[in-house]
Amino acid sequence: MENDPFLRQYQPSELKIASEFLTNWLPFLSKDLCKDCNHLLSNRIRSLDPAHCSNNTDKVDGECKTGSCSVVENMGSERASNNVDDNYDEKSENGEDCDNHSLGSWKGSEIVFGSFPEDFSSVLQSRPAVVETASPRMRWADMAQEDEFDEEEEEEEEERDSSRKGFDASSMKTPEKPKLSRDQRENLRLINVKRKKDFICLERVKGKIVNVLDGLELHTGVFSAVEQKRIVDQVYQLQEKGRRGELKKRTFTAPHKWMRGKGRETIQFGCCYNYAPDRAGNPPGILQREEVDPLPHLFKVIIRKLIKWHVLPPTCVPDSCIVNIYDEGDCIPPHIDNHDFLRPFCTISFLSECDILFGSNLKVEGPGDFSGSYSIPLPVGSVLVLNGNGADVAKHCVPAVPTKRISITFRKMDESKRPVWFTPEPDLQGIEPLPLDLNRSGSTSRFSRLNNHNGTNQRGHGRRGGGNGYDSRGYYNPERSSEHNDSGDWPSSQRRGMPRPSRRNYG
């Protein structure tokens, strides 16, 4: 045993602990073995402890010769091992008490399932490579649609695995778990995305009762925690570049925080957007002669995922975005997005959950404090799609956030409003949604006319693509029985479109 390449990786004290531990587990390990195999296994476990080994001339099934193997004598756990061996052999021959040897059910042994010696626990922690499988697990399977991310993560994982492994893993015959292909993993995540599209808030607009939230969609489960971390890290890197003056002048904006709610930093890509008339007299909208940086590569990866995963239609692929970096107390006042941008558009939330208020008549109660008819919590990693009345009739705002937050809003510019220097991104052309698993829905009629979205790309609420019509044409229809039953998630007052009983204090 002392020449075994596997055992050479361990200290004598560790082998002793392993020997004692496995001796206690011997009844389970030797279950259903014949006496000779049981005896061979017992001797092999005992031989793990070199401090108590002695040369022995006994042979076990002809495997051990004089001086070639050792049997541990006078071990502290010898008595317990022999007892369970005798008891096991006697009962197994009689066909009795077989179930008593399942994990955690040994009545005659001292060990209790779930309890490990402290020394042995430390050994396990110090030897993580021993219990790992030989094949590395891809940490970036979540970004399955992007080959470059998969390859990068595979290389990193292989380097970490190779540095941890101190032995030839191929010598261990560990059964491999069945692997899913990248397409299978992506499809599994795709069909598990939750999509809420039945927001209702009835308000009187121009003398008519309308659902001002018609067209809103909330998609959760689109971005994994790993993907979110990578995106947030990228945003902070861009923020540092902006602060160092390494981005174009109008790309990064960091206003002086002169009052509560006025310190939000922004990063714009694809176009420069003016929220209000500026000092030069430019009206709100896209500034066609102001130059900003193009979309970063990772942001284009996000856009492709939004299209492929049926969050945005392929007829409205975003070509610009704005990143909002909130500090505690920052906010966005009530507004309707300028119609220089087409509908639908979307915003993704990172770092922390916050509420977004909707209503045709939002009120400013104080710095960063607003009230409205309907409040929607935006979970971390969620995507809120604005279309129809939800984009053009109801205003929206973000009250002062209680903690740090990042949001990225992706929008497609009207071609007539694009900057004079703008060039469409080649890798954002011809993106198609991934096929959906029709068997999961139980009805193919829900997915009819999958790519019929020509009505969604309109400017203004007078000619908009039409809220839930976007869903009814079959772009994506989740399992309504589970994902649209929101009685436990949304207060009844919100479902009826009534104001909340009390206004939340965002201070």
UniProtKB/Swiss-Prot annotation:
Residues 145-160 have a biased composition (Acidic residues). Its EC number is 1.14.11.53. (Microbial infection) Interacts with the capsid protein ORF3b of the alfalfa mosaic virus (AMV). Residues 440-450 have a biased composition (Polar residues). Residues 89-100, 174-183 have a biased composition (Basic and acidic residues). It is an enzyme of class 1 (oxidoreductase). PANTHER family: HYDROXYPROLINE-RICH GLYCOPROTEIN FAMILY PROTEIN-RELATED (PTHR31447), RNA DEMETHYLASE ALKBH9B (PTHR31447:SF18). Keywords: Cytoplasm, Dioxygenase, Host-virus interaction, Iron, Metal-binding, Oxidoreductase. GO terms for biological process: demethylation; mRNA catabolic process. Belongs to the alkB family. 2-oxoglutarate binds at residue 405. This is RNA demethylase ALKBH9B. Its cofactor is Fe(2+). Transmembrane segments: none annotated. Residues 317-414 form the Fe2OG dioxygenase domain. Residues 76-102, 145-183, 432-507 are annotated as: Disordered. InterPro entries: AlkB-like (IPR027450), AlkB-like_sf (IPR037151), ALKBH9B/ALKBH10B-like (IPR044842), Oxoglu/Fe-dep_dioxygenase_dom (IPR005123). It is found in: Cytoplasm, P-body; Cytoplasmic granule. GO terms for cellular component: P-body; plasmodesma. It catalyses: an N(6)-methyladenosine in mRNA + 2-oxoglutarate + O2 = an adenosine in mRNA + formaldehyde + succinate + CO2. It holds the Pfam family 2OG-FeII_Oxy_2. Dioxygenase that demethylates RNA by oxidative demethylation: specifically demethylates N(6)-methyladenosine (m6A) RNA, the most prevalent internal modification of messenger RNA (mRNA) in higher eukaryotes. Modulates viral infection of the alfalfa mosaic virus (AMV) and the m6A abundance in its genomic RNAs. Residues 497-507 have a biased composition (Basic residues). Fe cation binds at residues 335, 337, 396. Binds 1 Fe(2+) ion per subunit. One of its GO terms (molecular function) is mRNA N6-methyladenosine dioxygenase activity.
